[in-house]
Amino acid sequence: MSTTATVVAPPEPQYEYYFRDGTTDNKREILTGDKAVPTFEEVPVVDIENIFSNDFDERLQAAKEVAEVCKTVGFMYIKNHGVSQDLIDEVFDMSRKYHAQPLEVKKEQDVYQSPTLRGYEIHYTKTPTGEAVKKGSFLYSYDPDNDPQVPKLTPEQRELCIGIHNQWPEKWPEFRATMLKYQAELLKLSRALLRTFALGLGADENYFDPIVTAPFVSIILQHYAPRDPQAEDLDGLGAHSDFETFTILNQDMIGGLEILNKNGIYIPAKPIRGTFVVNVGDFLQRISNDQFVSTVHRVRNSSGVNRYSIPFFFSFNMDVAVPVMPACTSEDNPAKYEPRNLHEYTAERRRLKMETHKNGIHDALG
């Protein structure tokens, strides 16, 4: 008597799709069981107090700790960062007040009135009954006149500083003053972090100093409108990686940020008061010769209440062609990328995002 064996087909792979390098068909398989690989299951908290130390050995040790996280996770909470909690609270308070204004008042700073698309933008999502507000964004950028280290610039270099075309509420000078104060504090922190990254990658800690005299900076006051937790579309910002050098995120206590690990699983970055979330961007991965990782992430607002966040995107001077760091190359590991002018790089990335990203110009421009 013969028997017939039943062949069970393996399950079809499941994937998470994300936006990167101008395309939306990037994917990562969701790995479970025997297919799972070692990866992070939480976002680490790093105490960066010693990056400000006068002792080089303490700065070096802190840089090694930061670099290890940037190589394995690409995301971290940072504490003891030196930015006043009172200022952070004031910025959030003003952001809430700004977004609570009538739409016609906010549209006085419509992004399309600015040649560099700085100002206010609103995003909608489809609902069974039509459209609803998904989120609102107020964007402003680096203005050299408000840098604690005011640079000497040629007219051509100044024109590359898109913040010279920032739009501000005319009848609310305190708003502008507070946001520029916040920008100044984060510029100090960003330059310190960049020295830490350089040291952690084996370079001189001042390696990047000459090319962040007039950096590309973009700051966005985000308001995610309340959503029905049962709604199909809960993405406040779809899966993507940041194309700048790095991001410092200031999030409220509602939560919603999720980080994609190597197994294709999203890990929540739950808010921790007194910290910022810092993540590696595509350009930093590029110039580190892929030693640092720019990790995919998304925002989902399933809370049913208003959510606010303030990402601060930081990159180098726009007119400099930045090469892969010599400290990240060797005879056996040559540079994988050609030097790239950041102005050209970001312009191309914006163009691709503008053409393909469903969430509009804010997500294209960062």
Model-derived regions, located:
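Peripheral, non-catalytic segments flanking oxidoreductase cores
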Residues: 1-366
